[in-house]
Amino acid sequence: QNLVSDGRLLEIHVSDQFSETSRQHLVEWITTLSGALRTIYGHWPRRHWQTVISPAPANGDDPIPWAEVQRGEIDSVKFYVSPTAGSEELKRAWTGYHEFAHLLIPYQGRGDSWFTEGLASYYQNVLQARSGVIDEQAMWQKLYDGYQRGLADTRFHGRPLGEVSRGMRQEGGFMRVYWSGAWYFLAADVRLRQQSRGRLSLDKALEQLNRCCADDSLSVPDIVRKLDELNRVILFKSLYDELVVSTEIPAYEPIFASLGISVKGGKVQLQQQGPGVLIRGGIASGDAL
């Protein structure tokens, strides 16, 4: 089955090993994911892309035990899904949003995993909120919980992020790597919105990159230089330089405070008044300020 939006094509390939009911659930799920992805640029990041869904053993709690993005002439997102998973269960799972978010940048597929996984980890929560699966409160709670998991991953505390990221597949440190990257993108998003009084955002900055270079295959240093150049800011490269040598996840509390978010007993609380409320809501809804 194919989905078409704004002249762009998404091929959906579902294994015939799924029942007809499961196939309907899977197409409904992909339709929700692809709709959420459109909230970033107003269109999909690729003109022609595909998703391939195969059955996974139904012997665990995770409805999507494995997924990956394969870059190529046609970018492909591959999911292995439990045959018993329903559409609502799939929509509540973070995995689909995470994998689709990888397509937001023209990444060459190697180096600086913290950057690409951080992008996907940040946007997986934002996209869930924008699709209506979770509310704004839950989105910030999920981000807080993620940063806490990253802070608890102390095995490589004191080692530079770039080094931990390079060795992650062999040695571990996934939470430190992923959530340091998610901090990078939250920090960039908030600074862009604050400093431009809402004229800029991470969505808009990445859209400029997509417009320029969607068909390119760029390294992360290339990407951050392009983001600064295209958006006429001094932010992405300097923040990259800061993060890659960081020896722990930077403090998220000042960012949360600037958005009117406090934490008590592990639960986020959202202030309803103050200068950060509109910015906070804009991130969750995708609405330009």
Where does each model-flagged region fall?
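Juxtacatalytic substrate-recognition/specificity segment
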Residues: 2-112
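Soluble non-cytosolic domains of exported or imported proteins
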Residues: 20-32, 86-91, 95, 110, ...
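Hydrophobic/aromatic-lined pockets within catalytic cores
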Residues: 38, 42-45, 101, 105-109, ...
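Surface-exposed patches in mature extracellular/periplasmic domains of secreted proteins
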Residues: 43-53, 107-113, 131-140, 199-205, ...
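Acidic/His/Gly-enriched intrinsically disordered linker/tail segments
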Residues: 90, 111-182, 195-196, 207, ...
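Hydrophobic, well-ordered secondary-structure elements that form the walls
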Residues: 120, 185, 198, 227, ...
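Carbohydrate-binding surfaces of carbohydrate-active enzymes
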Residues: 187-192, 196-200, 204-217, 221-225
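Beta/coil-rich, acidic/histidine-enriched accessory regions frequently appended to metallopeptidases
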Residues: 212-289
